[in-house]
Amino acid sequence: MDDPLKPKPVPLAAETVLWFEFLLDPHKITQHLQRPHPEPSAMELIVQFISMTPNTAQESVGTPGSDLQNLNQTPSNSGPIPGVVGGAPAPTTPTASGGVGMPHSPQRPAEKGLQLNRKQLALKILELKVATWLKWDLDALEKNLPVIMQLALLRDLCTISYGCSLSIPLPNDFDARISAAGNERAARFALTIYHRMLLRMQLIKEQALKAPRPQNTMYQTVDQLQQFLDTPTQPSIEYLQQLCASTKPFYIFHYDSFVPLRCDDIGNGQNYDVMHLITPQELRAQLHYELAQYYLYTKQYVLAREAAAACNTNLQAIPPQTTLYYCHIRPSELEGLLQACGISAEEQSLLEKFQQSLLNNYTDIVSILRMDNRRREIPFISRRQVELDIEGSISTGILKETVQLQLQVAALNVVRNIFEWGSIFGSVEYFEKYRELDCLPPLVEALQEMLPHCTFKEQAALKHFLIDCLLHQGGQSRQLLQTVRGFGLFSSDELQDIDEQMLQATPPVPTNSLASLSDWMCHSKMSRVDVGALERQLISCTNANTVRILLVKLCATAPGKPLWAINPSWDVPQPLKTLIMAMPVSFLQDFSYVLLGKARELATRGNYIDAVSMLSVLKSENQRQEMAANVQLMCKLITWEILHIQITQCLEEWHQKPLDLQSLGGRCKQCLGALQAGDSIVPRPDILESCAIMLLNLTEFPPLLYLDKRAGPLELPLAFAATFIEMEKMKGPKKVCRDAWELMLSMFLNVPKRGSSGVGGISSLQAFLQRIRHQSVFGLAISMIGKVHNILKDDPNHDLSCEYMQLWPTSINNPVSYSLRSVCETLQWLLSEALSYYPQTISWLKMKGDLDLAIGNNESAMRCYVNALVTGTDYCTMPLQRNVADDYVIRKMIRCAANLGCHMQATVLCQFLDEIDYGIVFKNLSEKSSNFTDAMDAYYSCIWDTTLLEFIVNLHAKRGEHSRKLEAISMMGTLELNANNNEEIKRESAMVRKSRFLRALAKQYLL
């Protein structure tokens, strides 16, 4: 029972004819081709006939009734088959040489004929008959037939025309004898087609070699195609030139020249008497056209111009009503050829004239732009570009023209701009740039030329432009108004109204520009305005003395509110604010509050120098005799604020080291000593934390051990300091203090414990890590978070490794209560932060690559690995060491490259392993690269393993990629890859290729 789900074959259409039906009925081919839309088409028929023709020579031909019987002689009741083996000996005829003439040669012994059986001969005749129906239009054949089938058709044409078996390409000393089955006229036609196709193939040589091959390549091998494309073209050029100069009549095939074989008539031959005689002009036009195309392709422009002119001349000499059988030149393509050669008879468009003017140093550019103002064919952006180019060329002396040319081009562009909808270029730039020159006459001249050609809508746009110029161009507006009166564009009422508006729009000219004023003081009779101006100056100033002067002025105005309340953004630390508010209301209270608020504001904006300067002035102010009661307390608090700002500045400018770090460390110890001594006044928590972190970055660990661990902000710095102290005392692989480990773990809890300290949370951890600067502290924090990541992820394939990681525990109680996502995000951020300060730390680069690979960011991981390898080789100047790139890292790079679709990069990386894994190599090579940067042949110069190159050669041979195969073979033949070389040469060769490959990876991933 048939499967109901099995798809049924689609029945053929009623009008579809199968190829073998044309063998049975010789007249069917003509009837089929005469249809309006034959199915299959003529091109499809040629493909089918060529595909079904076996490319093998038979030793004998069968009788009409049975092609399977091998008979060594012709039956007695039939005549010989012309040109077929087994017939009567073919008499000798004149030879077909590479030249135009067909010289007669002495008689030779009997030659072999076509060596084809009847099926082969019948199919070849049918394919040539269909090609003749298409008038041997090589453009159509080239467009619709694969290159190999074009060569098969050419081979069959030469074989039938000469009456003997020929191969393509023809040898250089080709002098084949025309047998009885051939014909001199036909051979001449076939040889002409051969040389034409040889030249045409050079134009598409690269595409022909890369074109997909038909599945059945029995009729032409890839090597024969390569040989045909590599054939010298000079003999073909000489042959076609001689043919153009010859006066000998030239015949082409008629459709009836090819007679299909009949099954009942074994003596049927070709009717070479029925051939078209074409005019010499038609022949020369076609040949000169193809010669001109070849000359253009090979950049022989003088010869191309001569050939194109000869083609056009011969084509014009053909009477208009003549039917063309051989010439297939399309007028548009001929015009393109003539334009390419610079001899076109058609008038150039305005854009073409514009481009030609640019090539000829702006010749006639003004007249072209004037014409374009009416036609508007040239893009306005191109005109603007030319204006700027002319300006630059004149200013640098490249263009020996006066500024008048630049002025005329700019004026014409202004006029064109009037009619550009949505243009961003206006007339303001023109008047501003050329104000010192006489810029009005060129503009008026351009407007007068344009006015007669304007439509009503364009006149309205022109009026708006003129009104804008009259009202906004100051001194030149009066002169322009007198000119506009003569245009006849405005009525008298409009002109009067414009005149009145010009009088009203004329402003008094200020002595200095408002934008150049040093302040924004507006002198007014209203005191509120003056007070507001003073307040704005007070808010914006950054100098303590200026603050003092402005406060004195504001105090004189008897303000209704305290002066320290002018700006709500002035924020003062609470201890200092308490002291200041306890002062009596006075100038000193306002001055202290304002300086403290502005200093903190400046420090937030990064202006540390002015902030410290203001606090220093305030400290000096409070040391006066009248402030003796609170001098010591106020100065101590201000000193701590100065220290806080300087610590922040030092951390922000860590690599510049602008401050004395030793002195800064001593002051930090003194500040923390106040907390340890139990003074009544201690620094605020932010200052204590900054001092502790600063000592941690200066590796001053002992002073931190004596502080109270219960102080919330100091918990993390103290735990890190204790860890470093224990690491110095530790002997062997002993686990260190767990305080830092437990504290770090508590940061990543999904729900923080109630009893935990106030330091818990990712935000407080990042606030601490943001101020880490020393490399060792970075390494300790990275190792802890990396260890937490390894334990929570629990995947050996994505384990991270770095320094100090062996110090931490290997397990965590209740790991599900911790957030792996927070760990990954924090570690990713911390590695980026650490690498911004120490970008050449190889272990961190590799760890960041491992982390990116674990989260699926393959490109970023590859970038980190490549950066590590480039850094480890001192930018590819030193050999790659195993401690930089071991097998573990290389295999991860291979995985990244494969995930990115760069299978050739993964293949080359396999050579970096201690022992090449050919299983991975062959798998990657068989994959199709999906990345445009991973061209297979781009990395042949980076391969030093000959086994790998041999596999690549075999792979290209299977795929039919001939040029790539040759390139791989040439790489195998280099001297440094010789298997007999000593080990030193082999190591040097591998090192050079490794360095070359690393540079290629760095160019792709790091630039």
Curated annotation (Swiss-Prot):
GO terms for biological process, alphabetical: negative regulation of BMP signaling pathway; positive regulation of gene expression; positive regulation of neuron differentiation; protein localization to chromatin; RNA polymerase II transcription initiation surveillance; snRNA 3'-end processing; snRNA processing
InterPro entries on file: Int8
GO cellular component: chromosome; cytosol; INTAC complex; integrator complex; nucleus
Low complexity bias (residue ranges): 79-97
Subcellular location: Nucleus; Chromosome
Residue ranges of the region described as Disordered: 56-112
Described purpose of this protein according to its UniProt entry: Component of the integrator complex, a multiprotein complex that terminates RNA polymerase II (Pol II) transcription in the promoter-proximal region of genes. The integrator complex provides a quality checkpoint during transcription elongation by driving premature transcription termination of transcripts that are unfavorably configured for transcriptional elongation: the complex terminates transcription by (1) catalyzing dephosphorylation of the C-terminal domain (CTD) of Pol II subunit Polr2A/Rbp1 and Spt5, and (2) degrading the exiting nascent RNA transcript via endonuclease activity.
Assembly, per entry: Belongs to the multiprotein complex Integrator, at least composed of IntS1, IntS2, IntS3, IntS4, omd/IntS5, IntS6, defl/IntS7, IntS8, IntS9, IntS10, IntS11, IntS12, asun/IntS13, IntS14 and IntS15. The core complex associates with protein phosphatase 2A subunits mts/PP2A and Pp2A-29B, to form the Integrator-PP2A (INTAC) complex.
Stated name of the protein: Integrator complex subunit 8
Organism: Drosophila melanogaster (Fruit fly)
